[in-house]
């Protein structure tokens, strides 16, 4: 049986799925929630079992929250969006997966959202020089904080949807206080607070 968990932060609803089912079991579940015809071709192109399960879990979460009449599609940039002939004012979405967890964030229409989660903080620690300046690294006291910065920058990248946006230099961690990370985007003249 699928494991769902929901979290609401302000006007963003996040649904989580712990991957325990096979792809066949998940396809069967999805077919009870929505018409799978629009998904068949793309699904057949996914080779790895784990990736198939992640892909299906994201769609199950979307249809659980939004009903059968929606379809997950992608902008040219790769950012997912919801489409429907019948339903108006569909939420914005962002999708992430790591380890055995899949999450989909839903926000009100025209209020973009970005989400990321990572199961392995040691990987972020090993590659920290690729996405954090020396100054940023001094601000982040341990591997958990470095992981938070990685997730924040990934989520911001998804949120901004700007091809070529660089993690190093164009997204700058300013401070980490009480579980909130402040990240500046100097070229865009923006500042983002990440929970």
Where do the PLM segments sit?
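Core catalytic alpha/beta fold that binds nucleotide/phospho-ligands
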Residues: 1-195
């Amino acid at each position: 049986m699928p494991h769902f968990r929901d979290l609401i932060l302000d006007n963003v609803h996040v649904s989580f799925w712990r991957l325990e089912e096979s792809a066949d079991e998940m396809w069967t579940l999805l077919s009870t929630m929505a018409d799978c015809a629009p998904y068949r071709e793309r699904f057949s192109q996914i080779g790895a079992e784990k990736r198939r399960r992640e892909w299906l879990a994201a769609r199950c979460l979307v249809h659980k929250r939004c009903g059968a009449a929606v379809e997950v599609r992608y902008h040219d940039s790769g950012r997912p969006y919801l489409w429907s002939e019948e339903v108006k004012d569909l939420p914005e979405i962002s999708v992430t997966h790591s380890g055995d967890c899949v999450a989909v964030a839903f926000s009100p229409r025209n209020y973009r959202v970005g989400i990321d989660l990572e199961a392995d903080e040691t990987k972020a620690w090993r590659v920290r020089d690729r996405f954090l300046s020396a100054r940023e690294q001094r601000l982040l006291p341990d591997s958990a904080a470095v992981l938070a910065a990685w997730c924040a920058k990934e989520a911001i990248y998804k949120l901004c949807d700007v091809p070529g946006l660089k993690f190093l230099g164009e997204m700058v961690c300013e401070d980490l206080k009480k579980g909130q990370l402040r990240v500046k985007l100097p070229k865009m003249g923006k500042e983002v607070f990440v929970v």
